[in-house]
Amino acid sequence: MEDFQASEETAFVVDEVSSIVKEAIESAIGGNAYQHSKVNQWTTNVLEQTLSQLTKLGRPFKYIVTCVIMQKNGAGLHSASSCFWDSSTDGSCTVRWENKTMYCIVSTFGLSI
């Protein structure tokens, strides 16, 4: 049982991280319509809130968080990432959030210390 708890405390838990990211997006953007002039503020708020909440978990990780906000206008977006890490402890998750006027895509990487 102790081994399970120890591994739980040092593992990257995708569901937990996704929940934190979704809350940060809702808090920063909420029901707003896309406004180009607000995008820098929104991305900064999403990133700061996400990192703040992840840090409060007190887990032995370094975090990397990226945020893309784009207007819904029919344009496509393709991205990729590649990591060389220990898949038993490190992890990543991507959250895609949308409303009628925009997409917000947040990728979070957790690297065990």
Swiss-Prot record:
Q: Which GO terms describe its biological process?
A: cell division; establishment of mitotic spindle orientation; negative regulation of ERK1 and ERK2 cascade; negative regulation of neurogenesis; nervous system development; positive regulation of neuron projection development; regulation of G protein-coupled receptor signaling pathway
Q: Where in the cell is it found?
A: Golgi apparatus; Cytoplasm; Cytoplasm, Cytoskeleton, Spindle
Expression sites by tissue: High level in testis (germ cell-specific). Expressed in sperm (at protein level). 200-fold lower in liver, brain, heart, spleen, and kidney. Levels in thymus and two embryonal carcinoma cell lines were several-fold higher than this low constitutive level.
Q: Matching CDD domains, A to Z?
A: DLC-like_DYNLT1
Extract the Pfam families matched here.
Tctex-1 (PF03645)
Coiled-coil region list: none
Report the InterPro entries cross-referenced here.
Tctex-1-like (IPR005334), Tctex-1-like_sf (IPR038586)
Keyword presence, Acetylation? yes
Q: How is it modified after translation?
A: Phosphorylated by BMPR2. The phosphorylation status is proposed to regulate the association with the cytoplasmic dynein complex and may have role in cytoplasmic dynein cargo release.
Q: Which UniProt keywords apply?
A: Acetylation, Cell cycle, Cell division, Cytoplasm, Cytoskeleton, Dynein, Golgi apparatus, Microtubule, Mitosis, Motor protein, Neurogenesis, Phosphoprotein, Transport
Give the Gene Ontology MF terms in alphabetical order.
G-protein beta-subunit binding; GTP-dependent protein binding
Q: Which GO terms describe its cellular component?
A: cytoplasmic dynein complex; dynein complex; Golgi apparatus; growth cone; microtubule; neuronal cell body; photoreceptor inner segment; spindle
Stretches for region Interaction with GNB1: 41-113
Q: How does it assemble?
A: Homodimer. The cytoplasmic dynein 1 complex consists of two catalytic heavy chains (HCs) and a number of non-catalytic subunits presented by intermediate chains (ICs), light intermediate chains (LICs) and light chains (LCs); the composition seems to vary in respect to the IC, LIC and LC composition. The heavy chain homodimer serves as a scaffold for the probable homodimeric assembly of the respective non-catalytic subunits. The ICs and LICs bind directly to the HC dimer and the LCs assemble on the IC dimer. DYNLT1 and DYNLT3 compete for association with dynein IC (DYNC1I1 or DYNC1I2).
Give the protein's biological function: Acts as one of several non-catalytic accessory components of the cytoplasmic dynein 1 complex that are thought to be involved in linking dynein to cargos and to adapter proteins that regulate dynein function. Cytoplasmic dynein 1 acts as a motor for the intracellular retrograde motility of vesicles and organelles along microtubules. Binds to transport cargos and is involved in apical cargo transport such as rhodopsin-bearing vesicles in polarized epithelia. May also be a accessory component of axonemal dynein. Plays an important role in male germ cell development and function.
Similarity comment: Belongs to the dynein light chain Tctex-type family.
Protein name according to UniProt: Dynein light chain Tctex-type 1
Species whose genome carries this gene: Mus musculus
Gene from which this protein is expressed? Dynlt1
